[in-house]
Amino acid sequence: MTHPLQGISSMATRQVLADLAAAWQAQGGAAVAIESVGGVDAARRVHAGEEALDVVFLASDAIDRLQAAGRVAAGSKVDLVRSSTVAAVRAGAPHPDIGTGDALRAAVLAAPSIGYSTGPSGVALQALFARWGIADEVKQRTVQAPPGVPVGTLIARGEVALGFQQRSELIHVEGIDILGPLPADIAIDTVFSGGVVAGTPHADTVRRLLAFMASPDAAGAKRRQGMEPA
């Protein structure tokens, strides 16, 4: 191929995909250029079908919707990584107890401001608040990070006191302390998948790329970026 494969992804997988693409190319695979943007924007652009894209990486349910719409080739979806949602505070701030569901609920109720993302973790967090019966109580204190901006950035700036997002989005943000994952009974985990964009002339190459990214050889890179193989 004379031109790199063109890909698009959500921000949550930006670093792990860069590492996996580099490993793929190091063992002789085709060059890959992946643009990472907010997941909602990425899905919208693939759905619009106006760009010459070859591969898309998004949350599993987003890939399913694109496949149902005919924008991702049928049967091409490959689950790649599982990412856990964690809680974080500004570096040096007191660490609230989040070890149980009741403790986390109390921490949320006590926080003067709460940050969450536009991605799947944010959607799941809002659903959790609704199940707890506190959605209305905390509504005025919740802040949604702009698309493509890590919640950790808002935490580090002091714009929110308690934030939630994928671990992979927060581990490289300076100025925050990660408290840890949510308790097992209310864990918010997201599977990210890849798919062949319908109409690409490089479908076979993309399938080989996705097979490599799902292989045991890719597990180490995933764990280094705070994720687990799917």
Predicted regions and their residues:
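Exported/periplasmic ABC-transporter solute-binding proteins
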Residues: M1-E35, V40-G49, F57-A69, A74, ...
